């Protein structure tokens, strides 16, 4: 594991080969860092230290429909042995959907400052949605569902929101229908191929990438 919060930004995604434009985090002791570990760390921070990383991992898994016995802080869905399993495929789909949502949100904005604010807003709403599932208020978080996507991006005040919702729904539905890791990467690459060059390689303030280990 690693001491302190693990943070990574920039570089290239090892699954898609595309530039990584957003910042990743993971709680102390994690051996992987990806969009899901970022949500786990954001969930811990949002709960002011009253929730452990393990509890946050279980909450994120439950909200996204993943097996709660899979520890997101050590499970690498891109590992050769894991990538061919049902859990590996499900975890990578969820990670890719989170990354795609946040990257498309950033791309709707004209400036880096606006992109940072938009990503932060959507991340906060996503964490609140995960907490609603943990509290029993709602049943699940579906990032390929237009009404849920619309609710998540409600705080984004500039850019073409209707197109953002449609593009995210289309991309994440394709990711959700993928039958293997390669298909997930292909769907994500198609969705993100036209990302603004001004955003590429710039660190923002929320989850992205789709499954790199802490040592990559």
PLM feature spans:
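Feature for extracytoplasmic/surface-facing segments of secreted or surface-associated proteins
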Residues: 1-216
């Amino acid at each position: 594991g690693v001491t302190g919060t693990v943070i990574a930004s920039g570089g290239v995604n090892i699954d898609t080969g595309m530039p990584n434009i957003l910042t990743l985090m993971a709680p102390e002791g994690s051996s992987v860092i990806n969009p899901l570990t970022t949500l786990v760390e954001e969930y811990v921070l949002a709960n002011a230290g009253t929730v452990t990383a393990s509890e946050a991992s279980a909450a994120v898994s439950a909200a996204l429909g993943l097996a709660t016995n899979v520890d997101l802080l050590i499970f690498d869905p891109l590992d050769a042995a894991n990538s061919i399993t049902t859990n590996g495929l499900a975890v990578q789909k969820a990670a890719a959907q989170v990354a795609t949502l946040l990257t498309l949100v950033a791309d709707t904005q004209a400036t880096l400052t606006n992109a940072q604010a938009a990503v932060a807003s959507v991340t906060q709403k996503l964490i609140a949605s995960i907490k609603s599932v943990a509290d029993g208020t709602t049943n699940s978080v579906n990032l390929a569902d237009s009404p849920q996507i619309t609710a998540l991006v409600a705080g984004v005040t500039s850019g073409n929101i209707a197109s953002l919702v449609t593009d995210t729904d289309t991309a994440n539905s394709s990711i959700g229908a993928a039958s293997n890791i390669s298909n997930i990467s292909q769907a994500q690459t198609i969705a993100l191929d036209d990302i603004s060059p001004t955003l590429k390689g710039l660190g923002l303030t929320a989850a992205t990438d789709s499954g790199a280990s802490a040592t990559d």
